Amino acid sequence: MTDTANLPHDDYAAAVVHALTAIGIAPDQWWTETPDGQQLDAVIMFDENTHDAMDADAWPAGSFLGWDQHAGWALVEGAHVRNVNPLELDAYAAPAAVAQRTRDRLLAPGEPDKPVAEAWDGAAALEEAVKAWEAA
């Protein structure tokens, strides 16, 4: 698929950004893309100099939240370091769950994960839209 005007995960990424902003972690920037026409990516950037909601010692180079339809969500250290920390959530987890797990990991890395409500009523529709996009 090469049409990048409207990707099936655009609204999902926007919902995660909204959920992050609602709990005080507004990203510096974010976007969706398909780098190869096969994988769908969402990138949500955090700058260590602009966020009190981040343990600067644990994330000295900042971090970004990444998503793809196969691996799901992960926090990645810095723009160049690439230490990948999966959020251990379903690939189509509730935006509020993604936001809460991200906040917990940014504030207290290494601590046990708190339970979050992963179920999301938009998951099935998003997964179907992604499958249709992959098949096109």
Task: Describe each model-derived feature in a short phrase.
Residues 27-77:
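Amphipathic, interaction-prone secondary-structure segments
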Residues 79, 83-136:
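Acidic, proline/glycine-rich low-complexity IDRs
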Residues 23-24, 60, 65-66, 113, ...:
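Intrinsically disordered, low-complexity regions enriched in Ser/Pro/Gly/Gln/His and often acidic
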Residues 11-16, 40, 72-75, 93-108:
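Hydrophobic alpha-helical membrane segments, chiefly transmembrane helices and signal peptide h-regions
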Residues 2, 20-21, 54-57, 110, ...:
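Alpha-helical interaction segments
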Residues 1-48, 131-136:
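N-terminal domain-onset segments
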